[in-house]
Amino acid sequence: MTSTDQGSWARSEGDSWDIVSSVGYTALGVSAQRAVESERPDALIDDPFAKHFVLAAGEPHLIETITKRDAPQASPFEYLRGMGMRSRFFDEFFLEAAASGITQAVILAAGLDARAHRLAWPAGVTVYELDQPQVLAFKDGVYAQQGAEPTCDRRTVAVDLRDDWPAALKEAGFDAGRPTAWSAEGLLPYLPAAAQELLFERMVELSAPGSRAAIEGPTGTLGMSQFAKVEQKYRSEKDTFGKIDITELFYDEEKTPPVEWFSVRGWSTQGLDMFDLAERYGVRHPEVPEDIRELAGAMHYLTCTLPA
């Protein structure tokens, strides 16, 4: 597969990637973090596919991460068990939406998200996964190797979110007249400001009353450059991404915080930070350095609802 040499990962208009390059590699790193969390005795999630994605990709550092870890994870996000809490938050969002009667879910930039296979969806739910063609093809190949079957009506939509993804989504069977559960997890830092604005506009245009959205996004209290500075301070070769600096893939542009964007358009919003999630899930942290505390408080785990 493609080399993990970051020198070739500079972002550009219309860039693309497979699972071991650029933004695709971040999905693989996230899968490694989910695999590590799933093996904990007090695991917040159960993702049996995460380790298989990592092993199939064959990237040595990530394989070592999930098979030979003998030291605490070093980056701020890992230090706080951020991936376990984030994944649990989105798991609960989708299951609660489905339990309320919402029968279609859309996972934007799905990456190696395995919820269509690992969550206990009610009968009649359709889950749409949108991402780059090479990423979805890799994931489908691993599912085939494992003999895995989805627990819902899973439909993949191979499309770049900078293109006309609403048309591709509708072609796959999406019905804009029915309420939808949307997710934007680990996505927004990789979008320019204009692309984020367009993404939100399209979500709203496609949302019937009663729709919901779960979004991981900045509160606006910490700029992306400050965020990257703290990440770099604590990053080491022992954390999931090793020598790879994923913040170089971020767009450091002024963006409207999602909570503000959706609120002014009539959606009700509820935002939680990482420490709110820790309290909800009973995660205990050791003494947290002030800059890590500031970093954790700068990200919202947001639930937005369009009144019925």
Swiss-Prot record:
InterPro entries: Ppm1/Ppm2/Tcmp, SAM-dependent_MTases_sf, SAM_mthyl_Trfase_ML2640-like. It holds the Pfam family LCM. GO terms for molecular function: methyltransferase activity. Disulfide bonds: none annotated. Its EC number is 2.1.1.-. Transmembrane segments: none annotated. One of its GO terms (biological process) is methylation. S-adenosyl-L-methionine binds at D131, D160, L161. The keyword Magnesium does not apply. The keyword Zinc does not apply. Keywords: Methyltransferase, S-adenosyl-L-methionine, Transferase. Exhibits S-adenosyl-L-methionine-dependent methyltransferase activity. Belongs to the UPF0677 family. NCBIfam families: mthyl_TIGR00027. This is Putative S-adenosyl-L-methionine-dependent methyltransferase MAB_4585c. It comes from Mycobacteroides abscessus (strain ATCC 19977 / DSM 44196 / CCUG 20993 / CIP 104536 / JCM 13569 / NCTC 13031 / TMC 1543 / L948).
